[in-house]
C-alpha cells in the first residue's frame, strides 16, 4: 500500500517480497540510506521541536542528502528509509513533503490495515492512499479502513489523485479532504464547485416518511415518548 505522503507498506512472505521491492525501487532511482544516514537525514528534515525544516521541503533528493551531510550517487532521485515504528515521535511515519520514502514491512494484510490506521493517526486523514493489488477483498477492506477521500488502485499516487482520462477522477489541483481534514467537501474540487446553482422550489404533495422509515433499527418509540414528556414538563 502507498500513501500520498511518501510511505509504503510492503508484504513479507516466504519469498521475501520486501527485499524484492527494495531492490526494484533502487533500480528505479531509489537510494536506501544506512542507519547512520537515516540519523543525519532525521536531523536535516526536522528541527528539535519536530517541525519540518523549510530548506528541505520540495527539494531534490541530492540537495536534501547534501544538507544532511552525505552524498547521493549519480542517478538516484529519491531516498528510501526503512522504518519499523509508527507514531508522532517517529518522524519518518509522518508527512515529509519531499522525495523521501518511509518504507514499512508487514507480514499479513490485517497487520497492514492496523498500520494504516496508526499512520493516519499521525497525519494525512482525508487525503488519499493507494494499494497495489488485484485482490478485490483487500481493496474493499482498505476502503472500509482508511480515513481518506481517494484510494488509487494500481496507479501512480499523486498524479492519479488529480484525475486522469483512464481513472474517472475529476481533474484538479485541489483535493478536498472532507471533515477528516477540516474541509467542506471530500471530492476533487473542480468546475462544478465554482458554478453557482439557483434552486427554484415550488410546493409539492407532502411525502413525509415515518420516523421508523427514517431511522430504521435506530428508531426507539420509547425515547420519542420520553422526549415528548420532557418538552411538556418544560412548557
Question: Where do the language-model regions lie?
Answer:
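NAD(P)-dependent aldehyde/semialdehyde dehydrogenase
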Residues: 5, 9-124
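Conserved C-terminal structural/oligomerization subdomain of aldehyde/semialdehyde dehydrogenase
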Residues: 70-235
